[in-house]
Structure formats: structure tokens, C-alpha cells
Swiss-Prot record:
Protein known as: Beta-lactamase CMY-1
Protein's UniProt keywords contain Amino-acid biosynthesis: no
Enzyme superclass (EC): hydrolase
Amino-acid positions noted as binding a beta-lactam in the UniProt annotation, renumbered to this chain: S88, Q144, Y174, N176, N363
Amino acid sequence: MQQRQSILWGAVATLMWAGLAHAGEASPVDPLRPVVDASIQPLLKEHRIPGMAVAVLKDGKAHYFNYGVANRESGAGVSEQTLFEIGSVSKTLTATLGAYAVVKGAMQLDDKASRHAPWLKGSAFDSITMGELATYSAGGLPLQFPEEVDSSEKMRAYYRQWAPVYSPGSHRQYSNPSIGLFGHLAASSLKQPFAPLMEQTLLPGLGMHHTYVNVPKQAMASYAYGYSKEDKPIRVNPGMLADEAYGIKTSSADLLRFVKANIGGVDDKALQQAISLTHQGHYSVGGMTQGLGWESYAYPVTEQTLLAGNSAKVILEANPTAAPRESGSQVLFNKTGSTNGFGAYVAFVPARGIGIVMLANRNYPNEARIKAAHAILAQLAG
């Protein structure tokens, strides 16, 4: 009996030792981690970013790098499933939805906007196309609605009385009311409200099952808090057409799926055609060519050119448009996005099969995002 107990305890000890030895083994380090850490760690420190999710695509494989916390109060860490507000990166999904409406025959980009909204008949939008709304070239619609436009009735009245400052198509004026109206009317052309159409048709078609316009109760635990300049926890306050212009909440894993769809395609033929349509250039401003949602550059692209295309001058001022540049076979697509508490950046190069998603729960300068992403992509391109 004593011998049997000794054998039993010996076996248990052996198993325990094996378990401890296994637990002590270091998990394999992603070979891309030093590359990503070198750019991201200084960023977190300099801009006091509480948490960041970085997702990288290389050779068809996803790599995830997570830093800090999603919620300072609970201490919940960031993961590739953490939901972040992506601000204007939402415009790329809105543009894809609009392109899907085109592919389905519900509308055309050269349709006059008032064709899809009887309440716009007799206004300036009898002469402004859906494509001009989608590409911020309607003639000078502002970055934001005036503060007093806080209801659907006031929004309609605002559009009806608005008059272009420039000839439609002649100037780019980056604008939430412009692409917001495009998304709203595109959904109307498909006979559905925008949010259900996005959540029930487009996002599932892209494999983005953890992405929302309105975060449901069961996903709220994954929703990060953003942090203001004063370090107060905040989330987006929706305004008019916020869903269409800056309303998406998603994870780095889901947003990288969208990048992968833009690089390698999707099975749904109509959706694939829609994605391709968003990549087509409509005009150029400097080195940047404006597509539907996406902004593109001939690749390789210098850091300076990327910074210029995402500068305050391009975002806040009206810029004359020129014929779209010939980009050749290699193109980098990108988009920045922010809300008061979050900062996002997405960039990818289809010909190289590389892409990056950077989601942070602080709104920090575009310049810092672009410098970090440019450095990482340069290493990925090898």
C-alpha cells in the first residue's frame, strides 16, 4: 500500500513538474512585435494613450498587438476584440454601402441628389450629384452642421436653403454633412434606414460580426471608453447624420477583415464590385487622390506626402480639385478618423498584401499616427 502511494505521489509530482515547466516556457514572440513596438511604445508614452489595438496584415496573415487598458476604472485590458469608435474611418464603410447601392442598380453616382430625396427638389441639390456628395465636392458644405441643426426638420431646412460657394466638382471641402447625406440617400435608394442596412447587410457580408452602429447591450462590456484631453472618460455624442459620417464602433480584428476584403476580395460578387468602385479615383489634391471614402497615393509614398495629404490644410480648407493622378500598379489607401475620445488610422497596399489598423482610446494628432504607420509599413514591405 505504502509503495502504491509512493508511486502515485511520484506520478503526481512528475505531472506537476511538467505543468510548471510548461507554464514557465515563453510563448513564441511574434517576429513583427519588435517592429510594431518600436513605433507604438513611444507613441503611447508621448500622447498618454491609455490603450491601443494594432492589427497588421502581412502575407495574408493577421498579427495583433495590444497595449494598455480599454477602461481605466475597471482595468480591463485592450484586445483585438475591444470595440473602439473609429470616427471618420466610418466613411469608408458608408462609401462601400453607397457603392453597393450603385452595383445593385438602386442609384448612380451621377444621379442628382434630389432624385433620391423629394424634400430636396427645388434646392441646390438639383444640380449636385451623389458622387460629389460622396467625395466632398458639392461646392463647400462645411466640416460640421451648424450647432443649431439638431433635429431632422432643421437638417432638411438647412440643406434646402444651402447655396454652394464653389461650382460643384471644382473644390474639395471635407465635410460630414456631405458624405453623411450621401450615406442617408444611398440607404434610402435601397428602401432601408441606414443603420439596419449597415448592420444587417453590409457588415455581415464583410465578415464584420463584431462591428456596430449602435452597440447592443450584450457587446457593451467590450466597448472601450475614450479619454478626453482632461482624462475624463467619454463616448461619442451622436449628432445629425452621425451614423453615416462617424458612427461605427469596431475592433481591430474586424477592421483588419475589412482591410483584407479590400486587398483580397470577398465571395459576394456585388460586394466585391462595390469595394472595387470605392478604390476608383475621382480627383486629386496634391499627391492625394480621392476615392469613395478612401484616399490614395502612388506607392511607395514618402512620409512627407502622406502627412501633406492628411494635413489641417486638406481637412479644414477648400482645395481646388485636379484630374485624378495616374497611380500605377501600386497604390496605398488610407483614412484617418477621430471622435473626442478616440483616434484611428487605417492604411493598406493591395499590391504588397500589407495593411495596418491602429485604434486608440485617445484623440491624438494625425501626424503621429501617420509617422508610426508609415514606419511599420516600410518594414512590412521589406
